[in-house]
């Protein structure tokens, strides 16, 4: 493949856009650098770049595009919004319809509020938890990304009982000291942190199924222990379901796992490809939010008709029979094919998969936390990424990210991808 136009456009982008990209994950820094491929259009399971190259897409915009690109039902909803006005600044019937759909799908959502991104949703749940409890600190888990607000850009201290340190320039140490970070899937470290800081903790923020250092499932009993220990200390439990809501079933990961948090943050899939976030939870907690309560949250674009109509349409597609069975069947096919080639080539590969989402780690170690994910071979992944790209398979340019199968992928797409993996593995 030739990427002449992509390279030229990237050079131009560098002159006008910081780093040439509008989100650092879109750069190829984590896979050795170079110009990222510039895409021109997308349809179904495929991308076409500015040089005319075609790709099978497993990026799915980092998760939102579960139906495939330009799904006709969602496209029609967006066209309807364009024709009737995309932004009112007033209440609309669509936000009521959509809120009811979310509540019906995820029973823990007694009340809901729409925002514009997953970052906003998480940020606001923390503010509401602080208002409800009168406390300031939060506990989060190492490697779990919760957006780019200051309070969640915090790395772990030297141990589970120590306070965090800033994970980005521009985050004050004073804010980092409001955060305790502990290893995911480690009940004892969490218990130790809560024994020390529990009376000051407003909320525990957790991905019920991790999506941000790869797909990682909770160990049996982990989430139950988080709920019990947090509630014993008087803290709330917030599930970050920005990636997981409607990813594995019609509803949240909490439905699949059979355990409910106090509040939930959502985004990505629920917007049907348009910008969106939502948060919700117990009524007594949510009534802390203005105009009913003292916790302020607002947004010019929040609940806009375009995002509401796209989200409604997306959920209508996902509610159809056989949707998640299709994703699971293709996911199992892809996992089996990759592992067969890995064994044949003698490569250290571990796959974490749930239904249509999987992560390929270049390690023989079982990956259950961030430290184990970090030990996977990033150099090997970088070579693999570029070999797959040359064969027309588009993956996320990071060893930590998931591959997302969409409703538009076919068995032929999976078969081609498996063959491409085999060719790539033989060159590693």
UniProtKB/Swiss-Prot annotation:
The record's principal subcellular location, in a coarse class, is cytoplasm
Task: Tell me the route in metabolism or biology where this protein functions.
Answer: Porphyrin-containing compound metabolism; protoporphyrin-IX biosynthesis; 5-aminolevulinate from L-glutamyl-tRNA(Glu): step 2/2
Which is an annotated GO molecular function term of this record? Answer: pyridoxal phosphate binding
User: Which keywords describe this protein according to UniProt?
Assistant: Cytoplasm, Isomerase, Porphyrin biosynthesis, Pyridoxal phosphate
Record's catalysed reaction(s): (S)-4-amino-5-oxopentanoate = 5-aminolevulinate
Query: Which Pfam families does the record associate with it?
Result: Aminotran_3
Keyword Isomerase included in the entry's annotation: yes
Keyword field contains rRNA-binding: no
| A single cellular component GO annotation | cytoplasm
Q: Where in the cell is it found?
A: Cytoplasm
Provide the cofactor list for this protein.
Answer: pyridoxal 5'-phosphate
Name the protein family: Belongs to the class-III pyridoxal-phosphate-dependent aminotransferase family. HemL subfamily.
Q: What is this protein called?
A: Glutamate-1-semialdehyde 2,1-aminomutase 1
* Organism name: Geobacillus thermodenitrificans (strain NG80-2)
- Name the gene that codes for it: hemL1
